Curated annotation (Swiss-Prot):
Residue ranges of every copy of the USP domain listed in the record: 68-502
Intervals, Cytoplasmic compartment: 57-517
Organism: Mus musculus (Mouse)
Protein name: Ubiquitin carboxyl-terminal hydrolase 30
Annotated Pfam families: UCH
The protein's enzyme class: hydrolase
Cross-link (Glycyl lysine isopeptide (Lys-Gly) (interchain with G-Cter in ubiquitin)): K235, K289
Reaction(s) catalysed (UniProt annotation): Thiol-dependent hydrolysis of ester, thioester, amide, peptide and isopeptide bonds formed by the C-terminal Gly of ubiquitin (a 76-residue protein attached to proteins as an intracellular targeting signal)
EC number, UniProt record: 3.4.19.12
Segments of this protein annotated with the region Disordered: 198-221, 364-395
Function according to Swiss-Prot or TrEMBL: Deubiquitinating enzyme tethered to the mitochondrial outer membrane that acts as a key inhibitor of mitophagy by counteracting the action of parkin (PRKN): hydrolyzes ubiquitin attached by parkin on target proteins, such as RHOT1/MIRO1 and TOMM20, thereby blocking parkin's ability to drive mitophagy. Preferentially cleaves 'Lys-6'- and 'Lys-11'-linked polyubiquitin chains, 2 types of linkage that participate in mitophagic signaling. Does not cleave efficiently polyubiquitin phosphorylated at 'Ser-65'.
Active site per UniProt: C77, H452
Similarity comment: family membership: Belongs to the peptidase C19 family.
Amino acid sequence: MLSSRAQAARTAADKALQRFLRTGAAVRYKVMKNWGVIGGIAAALAAGIYVIWGPITERKKRRKGLVPGLVNLGNTCFMNSLLQGLSACPAFVKWLEEFTTQYSRDQQGPHTHQCLSLTLLNLLKALSCQEVTEDEVLDASCLLDVLRMYRWQISSFEEQDAHELFHVITSSLEDERDRQPRVTHLFDVHSLEQQSEMAPRQVTCHTRGSPHPTTNHWKSQHPFHGRLTSNMVCKHCEHQSPVRFDTFDSLSLSIPAATWGHPLTLDHCLHHFISSESVRDVVCDNCTKIEARGTLTGEKVEHQRSTFVKQLKLGKLPQCLCIHLQRLSWSSHGTPLKRHEHVQFNEFLMMDFYKYRLLGHKPSQHGPKATENPGSAPEVQDAQAAPKPGLSQPGAPKTQIFLNGACSPSLLPALPSPVAFPLPVVPDYSSSTYLFRLMAVVVHHGDMHSGHFVTYRRSPPSAKNPLSTSNQWLWISDDTVRKASLQEVLSSSAYLLFYERVLSRVQQQGREYRSEE
C-alpha cells in the first residue's frame, strides 16, 4: 500500500498530465520542442565533460611505494614483463644513460640513429621512478615502433617470447653502437695520421706481428655481456687445446632430469651447463707428433684421432646476469611440451665454482681483493679477482663447501646423471668473490601455445637513499601492480632470472681498508 505522500504526488502528476492534454496542439508542440532543445544541450555538455576530463579510471594516481604498470596492446605481456625486469637492474639503466650521453656529446646534428637507446632509457627510467610521472599505467608502443625501424617483425597481437625479445634488444643496441663514431685510439695510427700537412706523403708502419687490437668501448661496458670458455683435453695424451672464448648476453640453462624426493636447484642447472662431455673421433695434433717421433723411417703418419673431454666455464662474468631456464621440451611424437618443474633459486647467487681459472693460478690466502671499476653501478664490482679459497680445485681434496644452499660441488655429478643430493643448507656468502643479488624474475603461466608473462621485481630505492637496494618486492601483470613477499618470489616457477653483481662482506671490508690507507 502506498503512503499518503506517495498518493499525493501521484495525484498531482495525474492532474498536470490532464492539463497538458487539454491544451491545444500548438502549445503542446512548443513545449515538446523546448524539451528537445534542453535535452540536446544536456547531451552536449555531458560529451564535453567526458572529452575534457575523461573517465575517472584514466586519472588514477599511482599508489605510494609502487611502480607504473604497462598497458597490454593486444598480446604484449612478453614486452611488458621484460621491461619491468630490465628496469629493476640499476647497472643497465646507468649504462644506457652513459651511452646516450656519450653519443650526444660526439654527435653534432640530430640524433637520428639513437632511437632505441633513448626510447628504452626513457621507459626504464619511468618504470624505475626516476622520471617525474604520476600516471599509474604507461604505454610502451613506442618501443615496438622503434624495433620495427630495425627491421624486426614484432606484432603486438601475436604471442612472443620474452627471452627472444631480450636478445632482439641487445643485438639492436649493438647495431646502434656500430653506427656511433669510433673514439680515436692511440693504436689507431691511421686515424691519427689523417692530417692536412701529411696529405702529400703516405706514412706507413711496418710491424712483425699483428696490430694491437683496439678496445671496444661498448662491449667493455655492456652490463649483460660476458664470455664463455671452452676447454678440450685429449684423454690419450692429456694435451690441452687452446682455450676458446665465446661471448654471451644470457645463460640459457637446460633443466636436468629430477630425482624423486630431491628438489631441483639452480646449482643443478648451472653444473649441468658446465659438465664435461666426451667428444669422439677428434684429430689430436699432439698424438700425431708423438706417433711420428716413434717411427724410425720418418715416413708420414696419418692423423691420429682420439676422444676429447670438453668443458665449459665462465671466463668473464657480467655485471648483470640474465639466466634463462629452458622450459621447452619435446615428446617422443615431436610435440612441444612445457616443463613445469619448480627450480629452486635464492636471493643471492655465488658463481665462484663456475668461473674459469688459468692453470697454475693459486687463490689468494688473504682473502679476495676487490677493485672498483670506474663507471660501474654502486656495489657492482666488475674486476677479475681470484676465487675464494676453499672451493674445490682440480686435484685438490674435496671439501664440504655448499653453494647457494643447494649442495657441495664435490657431490655434484661429473656427468648429467640423476643422483641423490643432500638437503639444502644455509650458504655462506661473506667471502664469495663472484656474488650476485636477485633483482627480478619473469614467470610464464600457461603452456607452449598460449599463456601470460608476469614479473616479480624489486621496488626502486627511496629518494632519500638512491644508492640502496630495496627489500620490497612487487608483482606486476601488465597494468596491475601489487606488493609481494620474498617467499612468494622464491616460490615462483622462474623463466628468466635477473641478477646483479655485488660486493661480498670481505670485499667491502677490503675496499674500506684500502681507502683508509
